[in-house]
């Protein structure tokens, strides 16, 4: 078992779901001494662009490694005011397969982001917390997959032996990222440089057949 921290300052979310576990809980303790997550992370524009590209490339590579397809990855630039550079994936619709393919894809973004922070010497407890808080949409989707496929709610109990607990899913995502980590980095740098990458380009860069 490992401890999770409840974050009472729920991030922006619809009123009816903002206190759901996939929004509230983080493995890193919450940070309250800054106006928002942007100030806690304190990235340069170049760091933020690459950080977001790594996050989305983690999703994309595990998804493609499982035999699924994406249409594109797009990195929207910062607007110079409030919005930071933010990458997103357009997934090819209609994918089917084992439930684990989809929850590992969901967890891979924040796990790739955290790994990149460690490997590049950028990791801080605050930045790790920000990575988790920004991943609530991914965690929500993982919850939906577990509910649909198994009729149970995704838990945040820190139970590394329970396949329905997010700690277990994060561990499996870490393991799945190990053999494809170089592909994740290669794709991330390409996204950060080119801003938009087609599914065909992503498959070529990572070596996965399309």
Language model features with spans:
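Soluble catalytic regions of large protease machineries
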Residues: 2-210
């Amino acid at each position: 078992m490992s401890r999770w921290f409840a974050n009472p300052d729920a991030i922006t979310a619809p009123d009816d779901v903002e206190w759901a576990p996939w929004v509230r809980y983080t493995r890193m303790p919450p940070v309250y001494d800054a106006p928002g997550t942007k100030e806690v992370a304190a990235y340069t524009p170049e760091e933020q662009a690459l950080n977001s590209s790594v996050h989305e490339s983690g999703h994309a590579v595990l998804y493609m490694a499982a035999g699924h397809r994406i249409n594109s990855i797009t990195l929207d630039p910062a607007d110079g005011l409030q919005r930071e550079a933010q990458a997103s994936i357009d997934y090819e619709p209609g994918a089917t397969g084992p439930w684990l393919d989809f929850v590992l894809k969901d967890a891979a973004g924040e796990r790739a982001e955290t790994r990149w922070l460690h490997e590049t010497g950028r990791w801080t407890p605050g930045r790790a917390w920000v990575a988790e808080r920004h991943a609530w949409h991914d965690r929500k989707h993982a919850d939906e997959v577990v509910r649909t496929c198994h009729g149970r709610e995704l838990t945040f109990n820190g139970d590394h032996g329970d396949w329905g607990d997010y700690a277990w899913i994060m561990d499996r995502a870490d393991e799945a990222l190990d053999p494809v980590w170089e592909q994740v980095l290669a794709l991330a740098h390409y996204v950060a440089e080119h801003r938009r990458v087609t599914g065909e380009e992503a498959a070529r860069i990572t070596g996965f057949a399309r």
